[in-house]
């Protein structure tokens, strides 16, 4: 079920109901596809794309979000290209990542030292869970970021800030131990922190862990502890479970770190699963991460730019166990599938056929939805799902909200291959949530 929720969030499509569903219907000639009329476009190619469609209004934002579908290869290249571009044009050096605070710490250690065993720590829980994140292309991108970082002056070097809820409790234990070595906490707080460390290292998560973290945070001496230590303790108190709760936890982390890390004057960028970057609520009214920012009182409000990847003809790497039998690669932990594109068979984004007519096979094309003459400033996003798909697994955009109020740019990715899975021996010990 966790994989199902993940793919609903990231790919706008479910898995398990396929045997009961027929393909999503293609648009009929009588159905207008005006949502993308008048939308300017730019081909994105090469190692250093110009991104000429980005105007000064775009660069004036503080937070830049790229929405992708995990398991597709080309977004990894786009992420690196966009990070480099924003570093050069907007001074972005803080990558707000879809990882937790512990993984962000070890990512920064890798950027500092280049030690591949440190990178192994980051990937071990993803590999143990047969996660789409455990792939060679993501790891290669991190290696490229480090090599590029070495060429930058200190004032422009990239660092990671993890906004997600805790993903790997043993790694959180290692992180806590590193924090305690770096900055000794107030003496009265040490016994409780030692107990937290012991619980984090247990084979199964203890239900008492959250309460212990709350008691540590309530200690009068905790204000003298490092901000990183307090942030880790806060994360241990968060309830885990549903995707809705996760969105709330991610936003809570941003709000806390925005103050603790003094990010008011920092430009921020990150690549996230595509549903996280939607700036308006869906029909059910529940706000995603970006929508929560827009509804908040943070100085970031109304200073967010979302760029959303949509896919045609692409292959996605998925855990084999989560796929219907006809899609599975027998005997393999991962399988590649082309069923999660946005022009069918499971979901159809109305207007995508028009955009495909304006682009070439194998291309990547940027479209500006908030251009003054674009119909997407007035017309909503419309998705059609295959018959038989449970409503609970559908993402329904509000018909009263224009497309540009959800995202300001689209990146149409055509005919990308899947990411390549890491071999099982690529990392060491197994992580645990």
Give the residues covered by each predicted segment.
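Bacterial N-terminal signal peptides that target proteins for export
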Residues: 2-11
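Generic intrinsically disordered, low-complexity segments enriched for polar/acidic and small residues
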Residues: 13-14, 33
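Hydrophobic h-region of N-terminal signal peptides that target proteins for export
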Residues: 14-23
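Compositional signal for N-terminal targeting/processing segments
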Residues: 24-433
